[in-house]
């Protein structure tokens, strides 16, 4: 039996049976078991930041697995320290005081990073956590409690208590929620760009307003950069576009370039709330995953991020000329293509015929999160293919 025939007989039915079997990849392209080549505009859902089979990752992972594969956090290893140092440097933007106050907790995924942030919020002793309507923070119970999408939560009620939802981007509404009892609000969670709901950027000034509100009432500002981080939007962290410094940042996806790794960065008092016994992880900080992350970070520097921003503008410019496209949202290489008709789901299926891998978070929206190494030529070819899928 083929892989696709065997799949539903052995895999729990969380995603259905995939339409194709992928067997290899290089850069921003992947190849299926029939030899068909596709431009990958999804990158494992914003995971393969450096594309497929990047030589820096291959070398780093191969060398590390040959030395030390796993040790647990009962012992120290050099790769985890080096990645933590680099993340703190990127977060602090070389502010020595901020860097000295920042610490990192490593885990295996975005959901786990958000679980850690949830615990940090709880450790403030305050009971209310405010999260955004339509936000997405993961599928584990804690991260799901923070997710403002009732259809994903309904089957698993009751949720962990204390989470309330505000309309994303509505500063006045959020302030009213806080001021009903400000001393009981532990944290405000937000994504700088909501990804799963169709790539919706926060309105201009919203992150700054949240930062000011948090400062006013001693509330933790927690930004979920699981999808937006590691250069995806043209800045290393998307919140840096708005010139704010959160108390806690969660990240994963692109950090390992394809290997599972997540991180929760906390600064100031938020970094001091976790103490021995309060949290833990078996696999978090795995030397091999950290070696991959170190390789990714060695490539994703300021010049690389500037190129991501430029490529994003090229994508927008070309997509704006496509019949049936009414808007292109997002920044860098995290884009939501808003269609005139509800054909996005069909476009995903038709994309295979035209040599592109697409994703549709809504009936009229195509989400593009390609490898950050995609070339201008591949972008042009991809836009032509998208035009054909929605024609």
Curated annotation (Swiss-Prot):
Assembly mode: Homodimer.
Gene (name only): argD
GO aspect biological process, one term: L-arginine biosynthetic process
InterPro entries: AcOrn/SuccOrn_fam, Aminotrans_3, Aminotrans_3_PPA_site, Class-III_PLP-dep_AT, PyrdxlP-dep_Trfase, PyrdxlP-dep_Trfase_major, PyrdxlP-dep_Trfase_small
One matching Pfam family: Aminotran_3
Cofactor binding summary note: Binds 1 pyridoxal phosphate per subunit.
Primary site of residence: cytoplasm
Pathway it works in: Amino-acid biosynthesis; L-arginine biosynthesis; N(2)-acetyl-L-ornithine from L-glutamate: step 4/4
Keyword Amino-acid biosynthesis: yes
Residue numbers carrying N6-(pyridoxal phosphate)lysine: 253
EC number: 2.6.1.11
Name recorded for this polypeptide: Acetylornithine aminotransferase
Cofactor: pyridoxal 5'-phosphate
Subcellular location as annotated: Cytoplasm
Binding sites annotated in the UniProt record for N(2)-acetyl-L-ornithine: 139, 281
Protein family (similarity comment): Belongs to the class-III pyridoxal-phosphate-dependent aminotransferase family. ArgD subfamily.
SUPFAM superfamilies: PLP-dependent transferases
Note: May also have succinyldiaminopimelate aminotransferase activity, thus carrying out the corresponding step in lysine biosynthesis.
UniProt keyword list: Amino-acid biosynthesis, Aminotransferase, Arginine biosynthesis, Cytoplasm, Pyridoxal phosphate, Transferase
Keyword presence, RNA-binding: no
Reactions it catalyzes: N(2)-acetyl-L-ornithine + 2-oxoglutarate = N-acetyl-L-glutamate 5-semialdehyde + L-glutamate
Molecular function GO labels: identical protein binding; N2-acetyl-L-ornithine:2-oxoglutarate 5-aminotransferase activity; pyridoxal phosphate binding
């Amino acid at each position: 039996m083929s892989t696709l025939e065997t799949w539903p007989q052995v895999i729990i039915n969380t995603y259905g049976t995939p339409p194709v079997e992928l067997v290899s990849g290089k850069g921003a392209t992947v190849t299926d078991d029939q030899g068909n080549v596709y431009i990958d505009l999804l990158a494992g859902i914003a995971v393969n930041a450096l594309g497929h089979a990047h030589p820096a990752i291959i070398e780093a992972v191969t060398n590390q697995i040959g030395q030390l594969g796993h040790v647990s956090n009962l012992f120290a290893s050099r790769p985890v320290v080096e990645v933590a140092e680099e993340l703190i440097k990127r977060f602090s933007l070389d502010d020595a005081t901020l860097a000295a106050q920042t610490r990192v907790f490593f885990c295996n995924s975005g959901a786990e990073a958000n679980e850690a942030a949830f615990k940090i919020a709880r450790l403030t002793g305050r009971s209310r956590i405010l999260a955004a309507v339509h936000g997405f923070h993961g599928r584990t119970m804690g991260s799901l409690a923070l997710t403002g999408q009732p259809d994903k939560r309904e089957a698993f009620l009751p949720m962990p208590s204390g989470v309330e939802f505000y309309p994303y981007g509505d500063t006045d509404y959020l302030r009213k929620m806080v001021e009903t009892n400000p001393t009981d609000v532990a944290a405000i969670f937000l994504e700088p760009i909501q990804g799963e709901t169709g790539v919706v950027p926060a309105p201009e000034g919203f992150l700054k307003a949240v930062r000011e509100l948090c400062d006013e009432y001693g509330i933790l500002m927690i930004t979920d950069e699981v999808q937006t981080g590691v250069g995806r939007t043209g800045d290393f962290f998307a919140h840096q576009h708005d010139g704010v410094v959160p108390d806690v940042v969660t990240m994963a996806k692109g950090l390992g370039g394809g290997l599972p790794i997540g991180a929760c960065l906390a600064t100031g008092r938020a970094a001091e709330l976790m103490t021995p016994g309060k949290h833990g992880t078996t696999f978090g900080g795995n030397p091999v995953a950290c070696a991959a992350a170190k390789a990714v970070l060695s490539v994703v520097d300021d010049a690389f991020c500037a190129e991501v921003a430029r490529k994003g503008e090229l994508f927008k410019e070309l997509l704006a000329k496509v019949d049936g496209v009414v808007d292109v949202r997002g920044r860098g290489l995290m884009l939501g293509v808003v269609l005139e008709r509800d054909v996005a789901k069909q476009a995903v299926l038709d994309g295979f015929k035209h040599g592109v891998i697409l994703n549709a978070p809504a009936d009229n929206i195509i989400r593009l999160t390609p490898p950050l190494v995609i070339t201008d030529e591949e972008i042009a070819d991809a836009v032509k293919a998208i035009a054909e899928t929605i024609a």
